[in-house]
Amino acid sequence: MDAGYTNQIFGDLYNALFSPDSETNLLAPTKYPDVKEVIDEIHGAGGIAVLAHPAFLDNFDEIDDYIEMGLDGIEVWHPSATDEDIEMLGSICKKHKLLMTGGSDFHGIYGSSTVTLGTCTTPDEHLDKLMGYKAKKKRAQRKAEKEALANAAKL
């Protein structure tokens, strides 16, 4: 902006350079890792694998595949999610006993749209389930480690 090429951060120049639909974009081709590998890495690190903002990415048709791969939860509450999206995602989570999360997707004050912290959150009851799930996974991991040590000692 200081050089005079544009008068706004997210405008015509930004779209020309960074929109995937622009013929003049500077974007490098993106190579995404295998979803199953990512889920396994998350679990291996002791994490909980949650599908981020499917309403924004419109990847509802891939959710069943992700569940089979070991998905633990879905971000249900997101600024881009409509009431219908929230209802559908909630139903999927209940059917498959998945965790339900939410968040504002705040990426700083210089986003293409104004989203403030705390505008979209995980309801307390689901936050409690998330914390309980994490504790349950830790207990199961400790139990498995103790059993492995006991079995190794028998050898």
What is the role of each PLM region?
Residues 1-50:
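Conserved acidic, metal-coordinating active-site core of Asp-based
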Residues 3, 39-40, 44-48, 55-155:
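Charged catalytic cores and adjacent phosphate/nucleic-acid-binding surfaces used
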